[in-house]
């Protein structure tokens, strides 16, 4: 079974993500060890909370360089929620620089009449990379579960893999570039659609291992 390093940096409950990966047929390993990251078949970076504490905790544990090295090596990577946002250069939420792996910034939803912030609950994805392996065998415009007040705004629009509309604002819900995949929603809370997304990620790891 594929061993997936699930990065522990004190930003949320990792066990629901691990359970989803186990159900998808992988062996998740919660870790903050550079050696584990290097030896794993793939990496999952979950996270809930605020941008500045997240990047602070990653850097205080000396995890920035191992993560960047693993991604640069081509290792499959899945970011979830805050684990998507900290891939970017900066956030309107804080002052700390992000990891800068994807060019762009994290923005807050604009206030508008009747709009609830945070965006919380079930909403539909619209694919912008319809043939992405992560979306295989999912229904058209599937419902997934969101909890966020901020969204990523990549400089290169081609990295967008899906969008979501909240009020009048259509924003990035997922990105994909080479071996990097990351989603704003919570697949581990998204019922059968979320489990399928995690299964598709695990299948990507198997395909890479065979290749």
Swiss-Prot record:
Q: Which residues form the active site?
A: 81, 186, 188
> Which transformation does this protein catalyse, written as a reaction?
5-[(5-phospho-1-deoxy-D-ribulos-1-ylimino)methylamino]-1-(5-phospho-beta-D-ribosyl)imidazole-4-carboxamide + L-glutamine = D-erythro-1-(imidazol-4-yl)glycerol 3-phosphate + 5-amino-1-(5-phospho-beta-D-ribosyl)imidazole-4-carboxamide + L-glutamate + H(+); L-glutamine + H2O = L-glutamate + NH4(+)
KW Isomerase (keyword) present: no
Which InterPro entries did the record assign? Class_I_gatase-like, GATASE, Imidazole-glycPsynth_HisH
Give the GO biological process terms. L-histidine biosynthetic process
Among Gene3D superfamilies, the record links this protein to: 3.40.50.880
Q: Which keywords accompany this UniProt record?
A: Amino-acid biosynthesis, Cytoplasm, Glutamine amidotransferase, Histidine biosynthesis, Hydrolase, Lyase
Under which pathway is this protein filed?
Amino-acid biosynthesis; L-histidine biosynthesis; L-histidine from 5-phospho-alpha-D-ribose 1-diphosphate: step 5/9
Q: What is its main location?
A: cytoplasm
What is this protein's function per UniProt? IGPS catalyzes the conversion of PRFAR and glutamine to IGP, AICAR and glutamate. The HisH subunit catalyzes the hydrolysis of glutamine to glutamate and ammonia as part of the synthesis of IGP and AICAR. The resulting ammonia molecule is channeled to the active site of HisF.
PANTHER family xref list = IMIDAZOLE GLYCEROL PHOSPHATE SYNTHASE SUBUNIT HISH
Q: What is this protein called?
A: Imidazole glycerol phosphate synthase subunit HisH
Q: Which organism is it from?
A: Gloeothece citriformis (strain PCC 7424) (Cyanothece sp. (strain PCC 7424))
